Amino acid sequence: MVRIAVAGAAGRMGRNLVKAAHHNPAAKVAAGSERPESSLVGVDLGELCGECKFDVVVCDDLAKQIDQFDVIIDFTAPASTLNNLALCQQYGKSIVIGTTGFTEEQREQIDLVAQQVPVVMAPNYSVGVNLVFKLLEKAAKVMGDYCDIEIVEAHHRHKVDAPSGTAIGMGEAIAGAMGNKLSDVAVYAREGITGERTKDEIGFATIRAGDIVGEHTAMFADIGERVEITHKATDRMTFANGAVKAAVWLHEKPAGFYTMTDVLGLNDL
């Protein structure tokens, strides 16, 4: 059984991760952390997420419980995630990263640490979204040369980064299938007189409103027809269950950088 620590356990996503780990027969909730100033430090993790008492309380530093867990699941913020990554590097633990908003330099740091410890990192842990990534690769190879490609994403009002990591992942899947780097073809905002659309660009539009869990659409538009590939999430447990699945899969894997494509065995599609 894989012993799981959840970083940011008292947040919306953290509570779902605790619940998902509790209900996964191959996993055990072994630790959970929050910021030292949080009033929820010391609260039982089971009671925190509406389950039975686990006899495992929220701590203010996972280093204090380093012997209690095998894998950290981290959906917090870049600085916090990098601290937990360093902890994994120091003690030989594995980590599942769902945090988004990393800079290019921070991504390079993650890649470097992944040479020493097992890391799964994905912009989205839903099975459906990762299948969409594969579908987008295939669509881009067939239609990318002659269609205009746009990505539209919508999330709740509290999301702090834009575009979403999933939207960027969709763009990377499309650009990679066409032999491009997303950074060379992405257009993240349009305003005023922009001129005509260039042939290779991939446009992004962002919506932040209400309580939208996550909606993403990639559009391949030609004259007379368009293809839209859409994923809509209605419950954060979708992401939490996928992340716990990744943690179970990652346990005892050799050091390396893995994605949900590896976890789900989608490379053969």
Swiss-Prot record:
Catalysed reactions, as listed in the record: (S)-2,3,4,5-tetrahydrodipicolinate + NAD(+) + H2O = (2S,4S)-4-hydroxy-2,3,4,5-tetrahydrodipicolinate + NADH + H(+); (S)-2,3,4,5-tetrahydrodipicolinate + NADP(+) + H2O = (2S,4S)-4-hydroxy-2,3,4,5-tetrahydrodipicolinate + NADPH + H(+)
GO terms, biological process: diaminopimelate biosynthetic process; lysine biosynthetic process via diaminopimelate
Domain of life: Bacteria
GO cellular component, as recorded: cytosol
Binding site for (S)-2,3,4,5-tetrahydrodipicolinate: 156, 165-166
Active site annotation, chain numbering: 155 (proton donor/acceptor), 159 (proton donor)
Pathway assignment: Amino-acid biosynthesis; L-lysine biosynthesis via DAP pathway; (S)-tetrahydrodipicolinate from L-aspartate: step 4/4
Keywords from the UniProt entry: Amino-acid biosynthesis, Cytoplasm, Diaminopimelate biosynthesis, Lysine biosynthesis, NAD, NADP, Oxidoreductase
UniProt: NAD(+) binding residues: 8-13, 34, 98-100, 122-125
EC number: 1.17.1.8
Subcellular location: Cytoplasm
UniProt binding sites for NADP(+): 35
Molecular function as annotated in GO: 4-hydroxy-tetrahydrodipicolinate reductase; NAD binding; NADP binding; oxidoreductase activity, acting on CH or CH2 groups, NAD or NADP as acceptor
Alphabetical list of Pfam families matching this protein: DapB_C (PF05173), DapB_N (PF01113)
Function: Catalyzes the conversion of 4-hydroxy-tetrahydrodipicolinate (HTPA) to tetrahydrodipicolinate.
UniProt cross-references to PANTHER family, sorted A to Z: 4-HYDROXY-TETRAHYDRODIPICOLINATE REDUCTASE 1, CHLOROPLASTIC-RELATED (PTHR20836:SF0), DIHYDRODIPICOLINATE REDUCTASE (PTHR20836)
Family listed: Belongs to the DapB family.
Protein name as catalogued: 4-hydroxy-tetrahydrodipicolinate reductase
